[in-house]
C-alpha cells in the first residue's frame, strides 16, 4: 500500500484566496517569503475561510494554521501538517 503525501501548492492557494475572499493574486507573488497576507488584501476572515476549505478537502483539522502571517509560512505549516497526518 502506498501513501500519497498531499501538498498544497501556491497555485492552489491562489485559487483558494480568490474563492474564499475574492482576492486575485499571481501565484509567483505568493512564493516570496516577505509578502504577508495583508499585502494581498486578505484579512483574517478570508484566511479562516481558506483553512476551513482545506480542512474539508483533506478531512484534517488544521488548528492554529490561520495564525501564519505570510502565504509561504502558511504553506510550509499546512504541508507539514498534511505530511505528518496531524
UniProtKB/Swiss-Prot annotation:
<keyword id="KW-0045">Antibiotic biosynthesis</keyword>
<dbReference type="GO" id="GO:0017000">
    <property type="term" value="P:antibiotic biosynthetic process"/>
</dbReference>
<feature type="domain" description="Carrier">
    <location>
        <begin position="7"/>
        <end position="86"/>
    </location>
</feature>
<protein>
    <recommendedName>
        <fullName>Curamycin polyketide synthase acyl carrier protein</fullName>
    </recommendedName>
</protein>
<keyword id="KW-0596">Phosphopantetheine</keyword>
<feature type="modified residue" description="O-(pantetheine 4'-phosphoryl)serine">
    <location>
        <position position="44"/>
    </location>
</feature>
<comment type="pathway">
    <text>Antibiotic biosynthesis; curamycin biosynthesis.</text>
</comment>
<dbReference type="InterPro" id="IPR036736">
    <property type="entry name" value="ACP-like_sf"/>
</dbReference>
<dbReference type="InterPro" id="IPR009081">
    <property type="entry name" value="PP-bd_ACP"/>
</dbReference>
<keyword id="KW-0597">Phosphoprotein</keyword>
<dbReference type="Pfam" id="PF00550">
    <property type="entry name" value="PP-binding"/>
</dbReference>
<comment type="function">
    <text>Acyl carrier protein.</text>
</comment>
<dbReference type="InterPro" id="IPR006162">
    <property type="entry name" value="Ppantetheine_attach_site"/>
</dbReference>
Amino acid at each position: 500500500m502506498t501513501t500519497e503525501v498531499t501538498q498544497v501548492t501556491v497555485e492552489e492557494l491562489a485559487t483558494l484566496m480568490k474563492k474564499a475572499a475574492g482576492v486575485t493574486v499571481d501565484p509567483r507573488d505568493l512564493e516570496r517569503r516577505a509578502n504577508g497576507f495583508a499585502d494581498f488584501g486578505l484579512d483574517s476572515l478570508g484566511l479562516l475561510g481558506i483553512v476551513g476549505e482545506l480542512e474539508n478537502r483533506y478531512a484534517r483539522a488544521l488548528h492554529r494554521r490561520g495564525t501564519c502571517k505570510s502565504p509561504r509560512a502558511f504553506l510550509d505549516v499546512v504541508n507539514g501538517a498534511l505530511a505528518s497526518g496531524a
